């Protein structure tokens, strides 16, 4: 196969749509006449992608919703499997959505279709039993982080570390002034801004919002120039947080609709729920305290399943506790406030942290889409040579 004529891609959510669009653009540079189809989002559609189903039909969360939607999801997967077994694409690329994609990838690869999976499932952290399926499913695993690549090397699973697109798009240096102006925040020089990001889900906000506000209240008590900014992830979270804020009328809080990027950019320090937003905060070079709290039984169950030393991406990438992780019983307002105060009171600590964030940023900045596209081309060329 000297050129790509037809590529199948399946993504399940907005983050995958961003990766898929970047990958499509990079492959189109090499193969302008290549056709792309499968399941994609608006960014991929804008590049001419033929989506056989709406991407939102795969976007399910939690444990209950996937069970309710199981017949529909299985039907979509069966339809795709039949389509690509009958008329095989030059390569199948599953982007994230491992619970949907991996079984499909196994079936297609067994039939001789070259398979790539883009974004490693978190097998390094939990559900390691999936490794056997991954080994059967992929000709190439594209990873966003170097520790994932090291893990797959140990498992003898072919992989390529491509870096993270956010590291490509976020500048190495980011100043606060422009973000504060865009958000309409006070421009007084002596004010210190703390961003609170208690999560995007109702349960996360329920467990973390009040803790974060109590922590901010304690920090504010000794620092009257402190100001609080909270970007609500959506309208539902905005309403939920507004109710909590009624009990904290003495705190100088600005509640936003979305705008989390600018909120983090405007901040001197961040209290943040564990999750992918911690990566963005790190790339913006903002000191942070990572926290998480959930129902006691859920935490007990998760602690039995999770095998990684850390939960926060900055710490996973550094392979050490670069920033505080205060989880469950340690996520008390007093401990959160004390950890936050270190950043507010020590310019030296903050500067040392920023230098380490910068080193990680450079490590992740690899032109992800171009690197991924070339990795796919090289894998297909190697398979072609073996087949000769």
From Swiss-Prot:
It holds the Pfam family LpxB. GO terms for biological process: lipid A biosynthetic process. Disulfide bonds: none annotated. GO terms for molecular function: lipid-A-disaccharide synthase activity; phospholipid binding. GO terms for cellular component: membrane. It catalyses: a lipid X + a UDP-2-N,3-O-bis[(3R)-3-hydroxyacyl]-alpha-D-glucosamine = a lipid A disaccharide + UDP + H(+). The keyword Disulfide bond does not apply. Keywords: Glycosyltransferase, Lipid A biosynthesis, Lipid biosynthesis, Lipid metabolism, Transferase. Condensation of UDP-2,3-diacylglucosamine and 2,3-diacylglucosamine-1-phosphate to form lipid A disaccharide, a precursor of lipid A, a phosphorylated glycolipid that anchors the lipopolysaccharide to the outer membrane of the cell. Belongs to the LpxB family. HAMAP family: LpxB. This is Lipid-A-disaccharide synthase. It comes from Saccharophagus degradans (strain 2-40 / ATCC 43961 / DSM 17024).
